[in-house]
């Protein structure tokens, strides 16, 4: 079963105007969302891209690392926990004139080892999956995160200028239908 949601704002940087087949990311990154007892573990980012925003832990892929290995490593570095029962949950493609172009891999974990702890990179915060603070997050999150936390997988294309979402195209999949691009 596939559902599609689409919205557009502005006249520049429409998702449909980009040749995504030839598009190349400048960075490959990951996000991890740990879910336990109908709550999701998010972070308030303390530094780097998105500092001050709430998001899932994650970061840039290192040489020789798979996206899943990166997501687990970054979660451990940012929260001092090891995510368990990890599943791929989507891919996000971000195009911006004033920020790096990013191909993001999304993962969900339904268990973890350790105690979520503040680090120099992040402050851990638990939220009910029904009360996610979208107003404090990247603008694109409101178009896909809730569905991913409810078990769908996502492929999303987003265009930004000055950290403002201009356009997006999002498709949701049941897990058995989702095949990552890379």
What are the residue ranges of the model-derived segments?
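Intrinsically disordered, low-complexity segments enriched in serine/proline and basic residues
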Residues: 4-5
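Short Pro/Gly-enriched beta-strand edge/turn motifs at strand-loop
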Residues: 10-18, 89
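Conserved N-terminal beta-strand and adjoining loop/helix that marks the start
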Residues: 15-41, 60
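Short, charged/polar surface micro-motifs in flexible loops or helix N-caps
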Residues: 35-39, 110-115, 151-152
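A structural microfeature
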Residues: 42, 90-93
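A positional/architectural concept
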Residues: 51-53
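Unchanged
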Residues: 61-84, 93-148, 169-182
């Amino acid at each position: 079963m596939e559902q599609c949601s689409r919205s557009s704002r502005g006249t520049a940087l429409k998702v449909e105007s980009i040749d995504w087949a030839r598009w190349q990311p400048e960075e490959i990154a990951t996000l991890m969302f740990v879910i336990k007892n109908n709550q999701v573990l998010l972070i308030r980012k303390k530094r780097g891209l998105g500092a001050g925003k709430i998001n899932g832990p994650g970061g840039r892929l290192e040489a020789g690392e798979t996206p899943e290995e990166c997501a687990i490593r970054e979660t451990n570095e940012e929260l001092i926990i090891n995510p368990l029962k990890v599943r791929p949950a989507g891919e996000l493609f971000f195009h911006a004139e004033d920020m790096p172009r990013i191909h993001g891999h999304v993962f969900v974990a339904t268990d973890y080892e350790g105690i979520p702890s503040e680090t120099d990179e992040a402050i851990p915060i638990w939220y009910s999956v029904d009360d996610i603070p979208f107003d404090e997050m990247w603008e694109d999150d409101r178009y896909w995160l809730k569905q991913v936390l409810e078990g769908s997988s996502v492929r999303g294309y987003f265009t930004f200028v000055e950290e403002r979402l201009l356009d997006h195209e999002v498709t949701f999949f049941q897990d058995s239908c989702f095949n990552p691009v890379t």
